[in-house]
Amino acid sequence: MTNSKLIYIEDDQILGNLITQALVDYGFEIDFRTTLNGLQESLASMLPDLLILDIEVNNQSCLDILPAIRSQYPQLPIIIASSHTNGAKIVRSYDAGANHYIKKPYDVTELVFQIQNLLQQSEKQLPAIWKIGTYQVDTAKHLLIYPDERILSSTYKC
């Protein structure tokens, strides 16, 4: 599981730095952010293996944008890490598209376990065809399908 790319969003800079360093020590590549601004662009450019979100980030709720993220990246594992322990908030997180909810404070080893578990599950469910914007990538046949349905074939594996 090492070298997996994660986007981690936490508005508490100190906590975020501590968790980021711990995850780096476990071998993960982390894009740590303290704001939801630019998240969609980062998802598109980085294509992370997993996303970790705090529910409330600088007076913004990630639950408002989570359905759009889930719609655009249906296979992306998403963990919500929050101090909210209210059952309704937890259920709303799952309804919005989260794969797992971890309550703060948490032990980093618990977070790492959940990350590894979700990454293993997502590897088993990889689709043969990925949709990236208006393009499609067929990983089984090594094809890039353009919006006008032109096909670029690859003779080597990426």
Identify the residue ranges that each predicted region occupies:
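Conserved acidic segment of CheY-like receiver
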Residues: T2-I14, I19-L23, L51
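Active-site beta3 strand of CheY-like receiver
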Residues: M46-V57
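Short amphipathic alpha-helix used as the core "switch/output" element in two-component signaling
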Residues: L63-Q75
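C-terminal output helix
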Residues: N86-A88, Y106-I115
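A structural micro-motif at secondary-structure boundaries
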Residues: K131-I132, Q136-C158
